[in-house]
Amino acid sequence: MKYLFIVNEGAYGSELPYNALRLAMALQKEHQAEISMFFLGDGVTAAMNNQQTPNGYYNLERMMKAVIAKKGIVKLCGTCLDARGIIDENIVKGANRSTMNELAELTENADKVLTF
């Protein structure tokens, strides 16, 4: 089954990005699901690289890399990145700048869409 996760909340401001990534990882592991994730608004901050979190605390960068490593697709709203001054060099390798047209295509191709 193909899942699309749409993540609007910022990194570490709420646990929604964490829960989205956690569920995506579980679906990949237990059900071999095809995962696409689209981060927009403050959600794009979850894709910043070089995140420094305390030992024992979840790290969204590592979680996102795990989703990507299992062939997950991670897209980031380009307009949202620009509005926050986030340049491509500062995002997780494998996460890609994207557009609303790509989000529309991902939505059309998904069996299920989940929003966080």
Short names for language-model regions:
Residues 2, 33-36, 73:
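Residues at the starts of beta-strands that form the adenosine-phosphate
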Residues 5-6, 36-40:
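Short, conserved beta-strand edge motifs with alternating hydrophobic and charged residues
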Residues 5-18, 47-52:
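Short, glycine-rich nucleotide/cofactor-binding loops
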Residues 17-30, 35-37:
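Histidine-anchored nucleotide/phosphate-binding helix
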Residues 38-48, 79-80:
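Short, conserved active-site loops that position catalytic residues or coordinate cofactors/metal ions
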Residues 50-55, 91-93:
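Short glycine-enriched, charge-decorated loop/helix-capping segments at active-site entrances
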Residues 53-80:
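A glycine-rich helix N-cap at a beta->alpha junction
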Residues 83-116:
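C-terminal structural segments of small proteins and small subunits
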